[in-house]
Regions:
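Glycine-rich, histidine-containing beta strand-loop boundary motifs that form or position
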Residues: 51-55, 62, 78, 97, ...
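FAD-binding subdomain of flavoenzyme oxidoreductases
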Residues: 85-87, 97, 101-102, 106-236
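Proline-rich low-complexity regions
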Residues: 23, 29, 48-51, 117-120
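N-terminal flexible segment immediately upstream of the FAD-binding catalytic core
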Residues: 1-44, 56-94, 236
Length: 236
């Protein structure tokens, strides 16, 4: 789905709280593979890409901000891709690009578990991925910031080429199309999930938050300790 009419783009180019600017188009892919194909076109055309989920406007990072950019902007809205896979008997989940904290909360209820974050925008569709990209801690001090070393993401390498990085620790295939389709359709078995030592949460937080005499806050933005892959990437 592609949106180019100015009036129809407004709900995507203007944040609920703040942030507003012009975008050449808004694209709403329905699969992970469609995101990949759109990104390839955008990289080749040398346009700015803003990845967007619910556009809650809490951080201002999911919309253009003013109109002083040096290149056209394409907004890729991921909310159609909202699958959540429960794995390892409910101990872990795989949240696709547009999956939300609200849906995660419902899916975890049978396992008597709760999401990593409870934030003000949970009820309006705040995404799991958005929280990880911003190390969002939410309103509950005891849960700490969102953090993972397990992710599948695209990046532009030093040669200006689009590259798919699989750090998810799930065997999904050998090429981009195979990997993305297998993940989208949950075409993997328990035996494909690698039991690694990579972290899916901030395991130091429980100690840090107890340091009541420290001059350093337990949680703060751009904490270098929590920068890894997509974690703390601010959606870049």
């Amino acid at each position: 789905r592609q949106i180019t009419a100015k009036w129809n783009k407004q709900q995507f180019s203007k944040g609920w709280r703040y942030g507003e600017g012009e975008a050449l188009a808004v694209v709403k892919p329905g699969t992970l593979l469609e995101i990949w194909k759109i990104l390839k076109i955008c990289v080749k055309a040398d346009v700015i890409v803003i990845m967007q989920a619910a556009n809650t406007g809490l951080t201002g990072g999911s919309t253009p901000y003013d109109n002083d950019y040096d290149r056209p902007i394409i907004i890729i809205n991921t909310m159609r891709i909202d699958n959540i896979h429960i794995i390892n008997e409910g101990k872990q989940i795989v949240g696709l690009a547009g999956s939300t904290l609200y849906d995660l909360e419902k899916k975890l209820e049978p396992f008597e578990r709760e999401p990593h974050s409870v934030i003000g925008s949970t009820s309006v569709g705040a995404s799991i991925v958005g929280g990880v990209c911003n190390n969002s801690g939410g309103s509950l001090v005891k849960r700490g910031p969102a953090y993972t070393e397990l992710a599948l993401y695209a990046k532009v390498n030093q040669n200006g080429e689009l590259e798919l990085v699989n750090e998810l620790e799930i065997n999904l295939g050998s090429n981009e199309e195979e990997i993305l389709n297998n993940l989208q359709n949950r075409n993997y078995n328990k035996s494909d999930i690698i039991q690694s030592n990579k972290l899916a949460s901030d395991n130091d937080y429980s100690n840090i938050v107890r340091q009541i005499n420290s001059n350093v806050p337990a949680r703060y933005n751009a904490d270098k300790r929590l920068l890894y892959g997509v974690s703390g990437s601010a959606g870049k």
